[in-house]
C-alpha cells in the first residue's frame, strides 16, 4: 500500500484539482477552510457522496463548496441531535434513580448491592463492572464538586446525585441490569414502551451520542444495534425488504424515531422545527437523505 505523504495546503488543493477533478474557484478560501477543518475531516469525511464510483474522481461540476456545505450541514445536525439526546439522557437518569430508590433506597449499600439487580447469567460480569464504576465515583477527591460535598458532609452519595456522572453508555447498561419491575416502571414514564424496546433505544442512542460528541460524521452513520420493530414503523408506512424495514432500524432516522418515542410532544415538535430549518438552511441532494435513512415522507413523523 502506498504511503500517505505530508502535503502542504497548496499541494492538497493541487491534488484535488489535478488528480481528483474537483473544481476550486477560490484557492485562498479553500486553504482557509482546510486549515479550519483539516483535510481528513472535510475531504475524506464527505467526498463519497460526490464521487464517481467508476473512476474515484469527483463528478463533473462538483465544487469545493459542495463538500464544505455538506460538512456544515452535518455539523449543524450533530449540534441539534446532541441537544435533544441529552434531554432524554437526563430524563432516563431521573426516572431510573426515582424508581430504584423508591424500591430499594438511595444509599450506597442499596445501589451497590448486586441482589437489587438482575444478577444472573451473562448479566453478572456486566453488573460487576457497573458496581466498580459506581463505587469508583465515591471519592473525597472527585472531580465533581457535588460528589465531594456529599462525601464530606454525609459520607455517602444518593443515587439520584450519582446518576449525573454516569455516561449514557453506563446508563444503558444500568437500565439493562435492572429487575423487570423497575424496568416496567421506567417504560411507563415514556408511555407504552416494551422493556426490550427501551433497552435497544438506549443502546442505539448511545452510539449516536458518541458520534455527535466526538464530531464524527453523523449523516450516514449506522449502528450495529438496531431498533426493535414497533407500531411507529407501520404508522409511517416504512417499506420492507426481505421482511425487514429498510429505514429507521440503525440509521439516523432510527435516532429520529427514538426522539419521537422518548421526548415530550412539545419537545419533539421543537426538535422537528429545528430539523426542518436545518434542511432549509442547507439544501441537500436526495442521495444524502437516502444515506441518512430518511424515507421520502419522513415529515409525517411529526404527526404520528
Per-range role (PLM):
Residues 1-207, 219-304:
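Extended intrinsically disordered or low-complexity regions, especially N/C-terminal cytosolic tails and loops
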Residues 215:
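Acidic/aromatic/glycine-rich contiguous surface patches that form carbohydrate-binding/processing clefts
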Amino acid at each position: 500500500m502506498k504511503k500517505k505523504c505530508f502535503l502542504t495546503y497548496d499541494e492538497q488543493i493541487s491534488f484535488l484539482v489535478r488528480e481528483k477533478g474537483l473544481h476550486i474557484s477560490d484557492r485562498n478560501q479553500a486553504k482557509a477552510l482546510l486549515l479550519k477543518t483539516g483535510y481528513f475531516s472535510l475531504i475524506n469525511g464527505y467526498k463519497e457522496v460526490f464521487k464517481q464510483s467508476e473512476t474515484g474522481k469527483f463528478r463533473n461540476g462538483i465544487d469545493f463548496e459542495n463538500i464544505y456545505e455538506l460538512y456544515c450541514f452535518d455539523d449543524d445536525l450533530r449540534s441539534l441531535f446532541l441537544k435533544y439526546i441529552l434531554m432524554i439522557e437526563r430524563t432516563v437518569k431521573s426516572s431510573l434513580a426515582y424508581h430504584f430508590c423508591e424500591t430499594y433506597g438511595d444509599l450506597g449499600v442499596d445501589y451497590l448491592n448486586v441482589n437489587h439487580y438482575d444478577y444472573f447469567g451473562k448479566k453478572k460480569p456486566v453488573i460487576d463492572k457497573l458496581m466498580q464504576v459506581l463505587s469508583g465515583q465515591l471519592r473525597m477527591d472527585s472531580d465533581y464538586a457535588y460528589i465531594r460535598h456529599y462525601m464530606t458532609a454525609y459520607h455517602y452519595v444518593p443515587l439520584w446525585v450519582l446518576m449525573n456522572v454516569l455516561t449514557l453508555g453506563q446508563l444503558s447498561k444500568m437500565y439493562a441490569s435492572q429487575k423487570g419491575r423497575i424496568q416496567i416502571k421506567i417504560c411507563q414514564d415514556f408511555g407504552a414502551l416494551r422493556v426490550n424496546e427501551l433497552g435497544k433505544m438506549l443502546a442505539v442512542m448511545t452510539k449516536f451520542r458518541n458520534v455527535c460528541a466526538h464530531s464524527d460524521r453523523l449523516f450516514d452513520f449506522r449502528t450495529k444495534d438496531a431498533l426493535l420493530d414497533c407500531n411507529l414503523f407501520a404508522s409511517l408506512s416504512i417499506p420492507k425488504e426481505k421482511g425487514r424495514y429498510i429505514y429507521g432500524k440503525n440509521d439516523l432516522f432510527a435516532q429520529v424515531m427514538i426522539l419521537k418515542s422518548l421526548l415530550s410532544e412539545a419537545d419533539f415538535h421543537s426538535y422537528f422545527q429545528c430539523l426542518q430549518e436545518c434542511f432549509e438552511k442547507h439544501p441537500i441532494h436526495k442521495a444524502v437523505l437516502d444515506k441518512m435513512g430518511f424515507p421520502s415522507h419522513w415529515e409525517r413523523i411529526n404527526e404520528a
